[in-house]
Amino acid sequence: MERLCWGWWWHLGILCLMHWAAGDTGSKTKSCSEVKQVYLAKGFSLNGAPQSEISGEHLRICPQGYTCCTSEMEENFANISRVEFEAKLRESSASIQRLLTTQHRNFDSYFQDLLNTSERVLQERFPSQYGDLYSQNSKIFRDLYSELRQYYRGSGINLEEALIEFWSRLLERVFKAQHTQYSFSEEYMDCLVKQYEQLKPFGDTPREVKLKAARAFIAARSFVQGLNAAADVVRKANQVPMSTECARAVMKLVYCPHCRGHSSIKLCSNYCWNVMRGCLANQADLDSEWRNLIESLLLVADKFNGASNVENIVGAIHTKISEAITHMQENKELLTNKVFKICGTPKKTNKGSKSEERRRKGKATQEDKSAVATMDNLISDVKGILSDIQDYWVSLPSLFCTEKVTAGPGNEDKCWNGITKGRYMPEPMGSGLANQINNPEVDVDITKPDMTIRQQIMQLKIMTSRLRNAYNGNDVDFQDTSDDMSGSGSGDGCNEDLCGSGRKLSRETVIIQPATHAVPRQPNPGETGKGTRLSSWDLLICLVALLVAQCTRW
């Protein structure tokens, strides 16, 4: 029996040697050449970088299995992941701002060119058409264009009152020019102006200008203000700082697979989307009011097309003024009789009348209208851009989760899921803060929305309301609603909240990910070898123990 036991021991010894040899072959550590290449490419020194995998109990963000990253490497990767994330957001934000400001500048420049051209044509033509009537009263025309510009630029001028004031002053000047043989007191002029509505000295032109030009200016002003407000919202939303929880999640998403030895595999798509939707939850809450603003801008843009477009109205203000003066000149006798009947006959002077001569000179000259499609082109461009950026806020995660970096269909089991190479089990979260309550990747406090984002949501609502009023032809008071909001920045170094041992553990590091990913248990710090090798060794020890016990009995 003793010989039999020794035989068993001999065979077990051979088995142990074979197992050790097999274990030694399987325990050969992986090379860290790939992660070192990535690390070097990011501008870091390779001093201290391991040649092969080391135990990962020092890691604070990445899974604590075997790793190619030291504490310093993990910290550097964490910092660079934050920098790259914020840089990509800034780049996207700057691109949208450029689009909006370019459209704002193009429309604003063209609209003001129309107004400037109209005034220039008036200044060139009216001296020859109306002689002293214009030269002695040119200030009222300059004042009109000045007030139109101020209104368009957002001042508190009441456009309707400005137009009424212009027509009243023009009535006084033309009536005096037509009756130079009379002397008019201030009281007489007051009587004349008070009868303006009844007399209708300029025909229907003032009413037409009030309806069409006022609507054009209201729409144009609201449109440029809306474009400016949209760009301002994008700028301020970009100032929202990256949260600590987001920074950890992005590091784990982007660089932990390198530390884990999986540099060549892609990210699990749903994993990437969950990280980004958690990080960009506050920004996604802008979506609803942003869409309302874009839709309102598109509605107002439609006002610039058709027979009553801006080119036909703003660019022809001087023509309408000329038509009004001509109408009054051609109906001089009828108007004079009505005024004298209502206000009385004024005292005569020794001056003669040149009104007939000026009336003949003052025939309205229609300006040749060139077929310019510039406004149509501008509106077509801006409508296309507005439509393209309508879903900007909810599409931000797609900046990071592109086809280039995420695994496609058929590769769901061969992607980085936050712990290892394998399938990602959790469902993708929806967009917006409220949908992040169960986000397994980013610990989001849905009860504390970002105040900068809330302020921008309110600005979007205010601007949308103004645009809707403008679309309906209602004048609105535009004040500059922009304010200098400064977002808090992030310093250098991997702070305690991000990497420190005293950090608040999120769901991703405690419960959710290991349970839902359904991956094998990772070795704890201090364990040697891999899980499968340890299990075989434990089994061998058990066999030896059983044999010893049996031999003892024998």
UniProtKB/Swiss-Prot annotation:
GO terms for cellular component: extracellular region; plasma membrane; side of membrane. It comes from the Eukaryota. O-glycosylated with heparan sulfate side chains. Residues 353-369 have a biased composition (Basic and acidic residues). One of its GO terms (biological process) is regulation of signal transduction. Its main location: membrane. The keyword Zinc does not apply. Residues 1-21 form the signal peptide. It is found in: Cell membrane. Coiled coil: none annotated. InterPro entries: Glypican. Residues 346-369 are annotated as: Disordered. Disulfide bonds join C32-C68, C62-C256, C69-C259, C191-C343, C246-C279, C268-C415, C272-C401. Glycans are attached at N79, N116, S486, S488, S490. It is a lipid-anchor; GPI-anchor. Keywords: Cell membrane, Disulfide bond, Glycoprotein, GPI-anchor, Heparan sulfate, Lipoprotein, Membrane, Proteoglycan, Secreted, Signal. Cell surface proteoglycan that bears heparan sulfate. Belongs to the glypican family. This is Glypican-1. The gene is gpc1.
